Amino acid sequence: MANQIDEAKPISDLEIMRHSAAHIMAEAVLSMFPEAKLGIGPAIDTGFYYDFDLPRTLTPEDLPEIETRMNQLVKANLPFRREEMSKDEARKLFADQPYKLELLDDIPDEIVSVYRQGNLCDLCRGPHVNYTSKVKAFKLLSIAGAYWRGDEKRPMLQRIYGAAFLDKASLAEYLNMLEESAKRDHRKLGKELELFSLHQEIGGGLVNWLPNGAIVRHLIEEFWKKEHLKRGYSLVYTPHIAKVDLWKTSGHWGFYRENMYSPMDIDGEEYVLKPMNCVYHILMFKNRTRSYKELPIRMAELGTVYRYERSGVLHGLSRVRGFTQDDAHIFCLYEQLEKEVVKVLDLAKFMIDTFGFTRYKVMLSTRPEKYVGELDKWEYATDILAKALESNQIAYQVDPGEGVFYGPKIDIKFEDALGRAWQGPTIQVDFQLPERFDVSVVGEDGKDQPVAMVHRTVLGSMERFMSCLTEQYGGAFPVWLSPKQVMLIPIADRHSEFAEKLACELREEEVRVEVDNRSETMNQKIRQAQLAKIPYMLVVGDKEIETQSVSIRTRSGSQCVMPFAEFKSMLIDKIKTKSTEI
């Protein structure tokens, strides 16, 4: 159907209007291409899209014409009319629309509904606005390829995306945000700032970290390790592959296989790239007999995992096939669970606050349709997570059915500078994997005592977090994370020696500094350093040598003169405190 709807879920006026905009666009496209075959056209978070099978490839130049025709349909004030009919009648109606016929075959009911407006008749549950004139603020944005029903073996259709809002002011605000988003796109900045690269010779979704990106990642990882060691975690490392039988025991082979890569044969045994680190940590825990007095035990790893993603959904650093999770697993007694989850929440808040994310949304994701284990343990685990959130006075929403197959979880999504949500920390309580691997400790009575397990990340993955961080700051990272923190610019050759002397003093404090001795003009050097988003440019000439000062220009364009010793002290303080301000 044009938009399959869960009838139990209330539908907002905005969602209804966006869905109607998709139908109006479909009629506009049909008026341009009468032979068009229609796919689906749902409302989405910020607007709508519709998929078409067309006689030619669309170009961006087609969008204004489609939009003009849409505006004509809106002004015509055409009514939306709902009709019900039998599936046989609908098959006759859509005889020349093969995609609609396929959708019809999947509908279990014998009576279906269609919506008509103007010259369009579409298979749809609705609801819709009463008249086309109710769709007042929309803009067509882009064209993309989309496989029919997301299946790469099916035809490739052309998808037109549009934005739609209840009023023109909201639309204008959104379009401004899109314009700013394009400037901050981590794929664009990643290339301009030489942060990372992707190569088809290597394969889609497999990332090369270039020197500038590698130093940012290194700084994040060192900070992560230091904070975990302070909080009682032990750092571990695990292999990238394991025998298939290990994943069968864990349940991943049965519940998660579609996200795993095909097995490889090694000496007659099947191995597979790991999709997760948890099972390795379990085996480490079981490496010897343990007493209940040793708990909790916290293992942390920056572990690279591999998960299958269709080529069509790969996106820079944010959707990849190989990525490094900031992973940790806590083994504890049942009565220690709530306290441990509270500690993880404290750590997660500290980490994301440090990186400058101050707004976030918290979801409590509950038992999915496919799950393992007993219902009472699921309820207990869910209750533990809820209590931990409430004891921290953290507001949250319940996200039904979005837990993982072995346990419920807390998902924290933080907002960037443009108000966009990014996946951040996750915290999962798990009783199932410890049972599957027979994990226990020697209790106070000398008998085996079961152990609970907490899976958690505080950043998510290094790749996705780097994409978010890049877009949050538009590539202008906080000073402590900037690949190059200072560029010294001598006005003339005779000033180079002084510039090199200052650079040496800064390097002794582990400041990342360079001297630009190229035969370019000073203004060109400053401009290039600004484009590279280096926080500080220090210009030195005769006056600066005489006064032992520096003329400071920041990447934002502000200027001042300061004694070098004062600047060095200020810079070191900003780095040590991880300030997000220049």
From Swiss-Prot:
One example of a Gene Ontology biological process annotation: threonyl-tRNA aminoacylation
Catalytic as annotated region, ranges: 185-478
Location of the protein in the cell: Cytoplasm
Record carries keyword Transferase: no
Entry's Gene Ontology molecular function annotations: ATP binding; metal ion binding; threonine-tRNA ligase activity; tRNA binding
EC number: 6.1.1.3
SMART domains registered for this protein in UniProt: tRNA_SAD
Enzyme class of the recorded protein, top EC level: ligase
Cofactor binding annotation: Binds 1 zinc ion per subunit.
InterPro entries referenced in this protein's UniProt entry, alphabetically: aa-tRNA-synt_IIb (IPR002314), aa-tRNA-synth_II (IPR006195), aa-tRNA-synth_II/BPL/LPL (IPR045864), Anticodon-bd (IPR004154), Anticodon-bd_dom_sf (IPR036621), Thr-tRNA-ligase_IIa (IPR002320), Thr/Ala-tRNA-synth_IIc_edit (IPR018163), ThrRS_anticodon (IPR047246)
GO-annotated cellular components: cytoplasm
Swiss-Prot/TrEMBL cofactor(s): Zn(2+)
Catalytic activity entry: tRNA(Thr) + L-threonine + ATP = L-threonyl-tRNA(Thr) + AMP + diphosphate + H(+)
Key words, A-Z: Aminoacyl-tRNA synthetase, ATP-binding, Cytoplasm, Ligase, Metal-binding, Nucleotide-binding, Protein biosynthesis, RNA-binding, tRNA-binding, Zinc
SUPFAM superfamilies per the UniProt record, alphabetical: Class II aaRS ABD-related, Class II aaRS and biotin synthetases, ThrRS/AlaRS common domain
Residues that bind Zn(2+): C278, H329, H455
PANTHER family in UniProt: THREONINE--TRNA LIGASE, CHLOROPLASTIC_MITOCHONDRIAL 2, THREONINE-TRNA LIGASE
Self-association and partners: Homodimer.
Function text: Catalyzes the attachment of threonine to tRNA(Thr) in a two-step reaction: L-threonine is first activated by ATP to form Thr-AMP and then transferred to the acceptor end of tRNA(Thr). Also edits incorrectly charged L-seryl-tRNA(Thr).
Entry's family note: Belongs to the class-II aminoacyl-tRNA synthetase family.
Name of the protein in its database record: Threonine--tRNA ligase
Organism: Dehalococcoides mccartyi (strain ATCC BAA-2266 / KCTC 15142 / 195) (Dehalococcoides ethenogenes (strain 195))
